[in-house]
Structure formats: structure tokens, C-alpha cells
Design a protein with these regions (language model features):
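Cell-envelope/extracellular polymer assembly enzymes that use nucleotide-activated donors
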Residues: 1-3, 33
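Short, well-formed alpha-helical segments that are part of the catalytic scaffolds
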Residues: 10-26
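A conserved acidic beta->alpha catalytic loop
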Residues: 35-45
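Short aromatic/hydrophobic "clamp" motif used to bind/position activated sugar donors
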Residues: 79
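The conserved acidic donor/metal-binding loop of glycosyltransferases
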Residues: 83-87, 91
Length: 150
């Protein structure tokens, strides 16, 4: 159902956290494949991809071009782009599946972005409110996950 594309830039720690969060989706059959697109000259990410059972794509160029290259290599009709270090909330599998079914039923092209989660230890207040308003004005961030049909 989904191909997940993660631009890693050679940073192992953040990519591993994201991969660990995707395990339930793979076990549920929602994730068909994960592509790690790496723009570094390090072999670390290739080893991580091998151990995690991911596809690995080395790419030279901009981050946008790397994401496009990952999309071209993906095999699934739906693409999920995740920033390395993104850890999806527990309900992401159900929400993604419902979104895909809704889009298929409507026949209209749509894309979805993942909401930011509130850190459990933060004090909600004016600062969070200002951040929310800023996000509404500027639109989605590149750090938010994107779910889109081919």
C-alpha cells in the first residue's frame, strides 16, 4: 500500500528512530517498502538499510531531487515522505488507511500531512499558541510527513 521515502543525509541515529516507529506499519501490511535516500558518502546508511530490510539509494544532488529520485524508485501507489527523526503517533496506521480509503472513494487527488504532536512534558501556553498560529500562516513544514498518491 505505501512506500516510505526517508532522506537520511548520513545521520544514523535519527533514521533508526524513524525506522523503529514504522515497524508496526510493516507488521500490519500497510508499508510495502522503505527507501533510504542518502546524499552522503558514508557507508553507514547502506548498512542500516541492509540490517533493517530497507532499499538503499545513494544520490548526489539537492534534498528535493533526492526525494524525487526516491519517488521514482518506489513501487507502491501511495508515497509517504518522512523527515529523518520523525516518529509517528500510535494512531498513524489507522489514520493513513482511512485517508487512503477516503481519497479512493472520492476520486479526487489529495495529499495529507501529519500533525505535530505535543511533547508530553511541555507546558501548554502562549508559546504553543503562537507556534500554532505561525504554522497556520506559513503552511506545512518540510519536517511534517507527507502522504500522497502517485
Amino acid at each position: 500500500m505505501l512506500s516510505v521515502i526517508i532522506p537520511t543525509d548520513g545521520v544514523e541515529r535519527t533514521a533508526v528512530a524513524t525506522l523503529a516507529a514504522l515497524v508496526p506499519g510493516a507488521a500490519a501490511g500497510v508499508i510495502r517498502e522503505v527507501l533510504l535516500v542518502d546524499r552522503s558518502n558514508s557507508d553507514v546508511m547502506e548498512r542500516v538499510a541492509d540490517v533493517a530490510g530497507c532499499r538503499f539509494l545513494r544520490f548526489e544532488g539537492t534534498r528535493a531531487a533526492a526525494l524525487a529520485a526516491g519517488a521514482r524508485q518506489a513501487r507502491s501507489p501511495w508515497l509517504m515522505f518522512l523527515h529523518p527523526g520523525a516518529v509517528l503517533d500510535a494512531g498513524w496506521i489507522e489514520e493513513s488507511t482511512q485517508f487512503i480509503q477516503m481519497v479512493a472513494a472520492s476520486g479526487k487527488d489529495r495529499a495529507g500531512i501529519f500533525r505535530y504532536a505535543r511533547a508530553p512534558y511541555t507546558d501548554p501556553g502562549l508559546r504553543d499558541g503562537l507556534k500554532f498560529v505561525a504554522r497556520m500562516i506559513t503552511g506545512p513544514s518540510t519536517e511534517q510527513g507527507l502522504l500522497i498518491a502517485r
